[in-house]
Amino acid sequence: LATDSAGRETDIAVDHAEHAHLEASDIARVRDIMRHHGLTATVSSIHINGWIGDHHKWAGALWAVRLWLRRDLSAEVDHWVYIGDSANDEIMFRHCPQSVAVANIASHWGQLQHFPRYVTAGQRGIGFAEMVQALLEIK
């Protein structure tokens, strides 16, 4: 399990790249076992996450923007930028035309059906900083 499991209330997370290092076949096997037992399961850059229900990042983003900003994200999604790094961001890449992925998305590319519009040259935090710098330059 992931080291932050004690703080999780709505999902289970299995570490595959934060402190442990699982092979791709083992990651797929854990994800498939979760799905076989009725969980929704995705793979992030560090965890294999499983949960009960059909909630996901896009539904959560719609809810959070409506609740805290009193705005309709689906009506103005063209004005938002989403940045991700793994296969579990695919639903956001599908819904967000201004989507960005950091370079380490490359290891998940073959799992995607919906792709980010832009991929940074830098990985992880460096890629995020690259995206922020680009936004600041065009503002």
Predicted regions and their residues:
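Asp-based, Mg2+/Mn2+-dependent phosphohydrolase catalytic module
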Residues: R71, S99-K139
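Conserved acidic, metal-coordinating active-site core of Asp-based
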Residues: L1-V81, S86-H95
